[in-house]
Amino acid sequence: MTEPATTPTTPDEQIPRHRYNADLAGQIERAWQETWSDRGTFNVANPVGSLAPTDGSDVPADKMFVQDMFPYPSGDGLHVGHPLGYIATDVYARYYRMLGRNVLHALGFDAFGLPAEQYAVQTGTHPRTRTEANIVNFRRQLGRLGLGHDTRRSFSTTDVDYYKWTQWIFLQIYNAWFDRDQNKARRISELVEEFESGKRTLDDGRNWADLSKGERADVIDGYRLVYRADSMVNWCPGLGTVLANEEVTSEGRSDRGNFPVFRKRLRQWMMRITAYSDRLLEDLDVLDWPEKVKTMQRNWIGRSTGASVLFATAADDIEVFTTRPDTLFGATYLVLAPEHDLVDTLVTDAWPDGTDERWTYGAATPREAVAAYRTDIAAKSDLERQENKTKTGVFLGAYATNPADGKQVPIFIADYVLAGYGTGAIMAVPGGDQRDWDFAKEFGLPIIEVVTGGDISEAAYAGDGTMVNSGFLDGMDVASAKEAIIARLEADGRGKRRVEYKLRDWLFARQRYWGEPFPIVYDADGRAHPLPESALPVELPDVPDYSPVLFDPDDADSEPSPPLNKATEWVHVELDLGDGLQSYTRDTNVMPQWAGSSWYELRYTDPHNPDEMCAKENEAYWMGPRPDEHGPEDPGGVDLYVGGVEHAVLHLLYSRFWHKVLYDLGYVSSREPYRRLVNQGYIQAFAYTDSRGTYVPAAEVIERDGKFFWPGPDGEIEVNQEFGKIGKSLKNSVSPDEICDNYGADTLRVYEMSMGPLEASRPWATKDVVGAHRFLQRVWRVVIDETSGNVRVVEHEALSDETLRLLHRTIEGVREDYAALRNNTAAAKLIEYTNHLTKEGVAARAAIEPLVLMVAPLAPHLAEELWKRLGHDTSLAHGPFPEADPQYLVEDTIEFPVQVNGKVRGKIVVAADADKAALEAAALADEKVQAFLAGATPKKVIVVPGRLVNLVV
């Protein structure tokens, strides 16, 4: 809605000449931003390299590394929701800088990705042109906010000097394998040495020395942390690219563009993140992260303990994984994922006699039924398949043998079983699993009770109980039955104990243009070869156009063709990779957008290093473990990382994985990238929709008689009001430029920090911004005479006891609040103190200078200006920050509630050191208490020290 955004409310001639208003704020802010830039106020030194102290001095031991989740530079620029986290981290960094800490705070840009590429496709403009223009605008907008960044350390993931090291890290991971005995990554060269020495033998019994060069390469490729696999992927013909599971909506459509997505088997680059499942889980315990985020990661990794069980068939054994092997006697059918490798082998040519018609999918033969079913589910996402309440499936015409009792059970395919989880096959126990129960009811399959405690005629029962109908397990409890059946399966060679995970390996290729090229080439036989580090960076070539080949969105049979295929001269190269000059073909996929953000914290520590990702000394200084400060289990990492909870799983999981590989290989000393994480909330605002549910510009909506109207192109219409996250999609954005123009950046900073706790979402109301502005005007008036512009502070005015106590309580409280990111309560304390100074007319320097210093993290431009006018010739950016005098933190008096028979009837104020007798006397003397006593003498007086007095009548 349109709201007034101007500060003055009186005619210009009545406004004091030196009032703090938008114009003066703008002048002050521009001047101090220029001063900070010229002086390098926020530049911070490294132990070694180009950013080391030029005088040879050591860097301070007391450091602080603060980091924001860096922005994607969209063409729309910032809205007021974006700076929330940036301002909060700036307040935090400024506070610790004033305490004397060596603070690293910088901001780069996560600039690869689909939006810039789509714009390039539409306009023919190179994505870099659009991206760099967007970055210029972002830097301009962010610069207005007065963020204390070391701008020398800024970069974009699209900078060649940056993605050279993204490619380098890819090669380190590619040239590594995970040694399960040592529970860590090791270099491929060490694996080769073990095979050559005989220390390690091949699982299939072959002799390493007898293998050809190609066979050895195949063996090694099977160990690599980066590998190619024929895997089920999410193919989006409408975008011309493969999508990760996380980029597909629950409706089976692309998150961007809303195109249909199909499950398809393609050869793709994968990263073996699953090798780190246990370490990714275990190290969550040593991180100072929100429990919600830890839970999300634990659930995503999804560790479960159970058993693998082999069911014999006429073709081959079917391996299933189950967390409830105790229920094996209740398995009445098997279900395979429709994509399971054995489906085409097991399916029969004709239906067995007496096949239930419900099992046939309406087809004449099992093969026809399987083909039809696969076609019908091709567009479903994994999430949609698992959440689908209507159970569908097809009988393969084949049976398997239950190893527990030797009975034959039918084999089905169904979409609720996923190829990517476990073995892609389940033993269905309808008495113990609700999805199996629903399927059994739908298809008329037996339901057997194997654990007492439920009513399987009504629903499955998955709880504990006593085993029944389970042969030798009968009478056991569930835990004992699990151990007994696993022992039997292992003895019979039909199963074994096993741990399984929901986490899948990371699909690491995209059929796009605007991303990091792979440092991989293929020889004439199609074998992949990593490029030597000397060949980095592999730069993106220019292409005639930037779009992948797009297909009919519904064409599930289409095949991806990346846009880099069009750069034919770049694709075909002559290289000497150790066997003489040969012809090779470059990989034409690009890395996913997650790649650049999976390691950027490291580059902040050493952004100009041409020879290393980062020098070990710099990483160890900024990110190394500090057990003396953080405890013996400190994993190291960035001291504070702030960003949205929407990145709780993907970005944070991927960056943890990369960091752990680099740790294992000895490149970093920290075993985690981010020691502490805080998720900021969203800024929300009213949005408005027309009768069709289409959003209309909130700024154009008018409120009249409790209703809302929009003056659309066809005349005014009534619209509906709702509340949501501020942003482009809801058409309720407010630009920070607008607020800076009308009030100043310091006002925006104070307003956003005052709106509520950082972690909570909060409502935006432009009309309320003036409150923050008026607070800063009061701070200004405490120091500056608005009429003359002179400093009104006096040197030796004595402070009253009340002012002294409030001052030092404010100092103590603000210090605690800033350290805990409670900027809203810090602002409240500063407002209270400022109001006191104004009301009492306090002009003493001893009372006012601490206020200016305490305001500095929130409103740095104003504070710097006032500090200078108070006669200081150095910036306050590096302190000092006021310290509270303990003698003024002790209360002289304490208020106690007084109860009569357990109900509060009055309050007394007594000396802080009053004894029990004094408390009792004061309580009995209180007029309100006397009225309730009505002359009666209490039978008992109970004094709870520090809390209350209770009179029992």
UniProtKB/Swiss-Prot annotation:
Q: Which InterPro entries match?
A: aa-tRNA-synth_I_CS (IPR001412), Leu-tRNA-ligase (IPR002302), Leu_tRNA-synth_edit (IPR025709), M/V/L/I-tRNA-synth_anticd-bd (IPR013155), Methionyl/Leucyl_tRNA_Synth (IPR015413), Rossmann-like_a/b/a_fold (IPR014729), tRNAsynth_Ia_anticodon-bd (IPR009080), Val/Leu/Ile-tRNA-synth_edit (IPR009008)
Tell me where the sequence motif 'HIGH' region sits in this chain. 71-82
What is this enzyme's class at the first EC digit?
A: ligase
Cellular compartments per GO CC: cytosol
Q: Please give the coiled-coil regions recorded for this protein.
A: none
Localization recorded for this chain is:
Cytoplasm
- UniProt GO BP: leucyl-tRNA aminoacylation
The record's section on PANTHER family has: LEUCINE--TRNA LIGASE, MITOCHONDRIAL (PTHR43740:SF2), LEUCYL-TRNA SYNTHETASE (PTHR43740)
Q: Which UniProt keywords apply?
A: Aminoacyl-tRNA synthetase, ATP-binding, Cytoplasm, Ligase, Nucleotide-binding, Protein biosynthesis
> Motif 'KMSKS' region located where?
725-729
Q: Which family does it belong to?
A: Belongs to the class-I aminoacyl-tRNA synthetase family.
Keyword Iron-sulfur (UniProt): no
Which GO terms of the molecular function aspect are on file? aminoacyl-tRNA deacylase activity; ATP binding; leucine-tRNA ligase activity
What protein name is recorded for this chain?
Leucine--tRNA ligase
